[in-house]
Amino acid sequence: MVEEIGPENVVHVVTDNGSNYKKACKELLSEVYEHIAWTPCLAHTVNLMLKDIARRPEHGVIIKQCKRISNWLHNHGQLNTMMRNAIGGELVKWNATRFGTNYMFLESIYRKRDRFMQWMASTEFQHSKWANTEDGRFTHASFASMEWWDALKYIIDTVQPIYKFLRFADQDKKPNICEVVMAYQTIKQELRSFFGTNVSTLKEYIQVVDERLGDVFIGTYVGPGKHVCSSIFKLY
C-alpha cells in the first residue's frame, strides 16, 4: 500500500491492533520507512482496554452470571416473550468480541432492575414451569438480592469513563491527537473521582489504560520520552 501511494506521500499509518499488523508495521516502518509513524486504531485500542478490565475477578464473576441469565432468557421462546412483556422490551445482546457492547448489555439489565424484581416475584413467573429450574432459581436469587444489583452497578460505574472514551473514539469525525490526549486526561480524572482513596485499584485501572494507549501515543510527539506532554503517563 505504501509503495502504491508512494512513501514520500505517507507520514502516518493506522491499522488494526492485531499482533500480526503490529509486528509487520513496526518492522517495516522502522527498517524501511523511518519517516512514517504507525499507530493502532483508537477505537479497537479502547475496546481492548475493556477486554483487559473484564478479566478482573469482580468483573468476571458478574459478567459470567449475567451471560448465564441472558442465555437462559433467550434460549426459550416462551420465556423470552414473558420477559419482554414483563420488562417492556429486550436486552442488549451479548457480543463475544465487542467489549463495549458487552457493558451496554450489563447496563441494559441494570436499567430494568425494578421490572425484573417485580417479574421474579409475580404469580405469572412463580407459577411458570421455569421458576423451579436450576437457572430459574439462580436468576430469582440474583434478581432478589440487593447486594447482587449493587455489585452489577459497581462494575458498570467503574468502566463508564472508558466506555465514554470508546464512544469518543468511534465517532464518525475522527479525533486528532490533541483531542485524544484531552480525553485521556478526562479518563484519569473521572477514575480518580470514582475510586477516591482506593489508590491501589486506581493504579491498576490506569495501568490498563496506559499500556493500551502506549502504542497510540508512541508514534506521536506526546509519547513517552517525547518533549511534549511528557507528564501524561503518570499513573495518577
Task: Please annotate each region the language model reported.
Residues 1-236:
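A eukaryotic "domain-edge + linker/cap" signature
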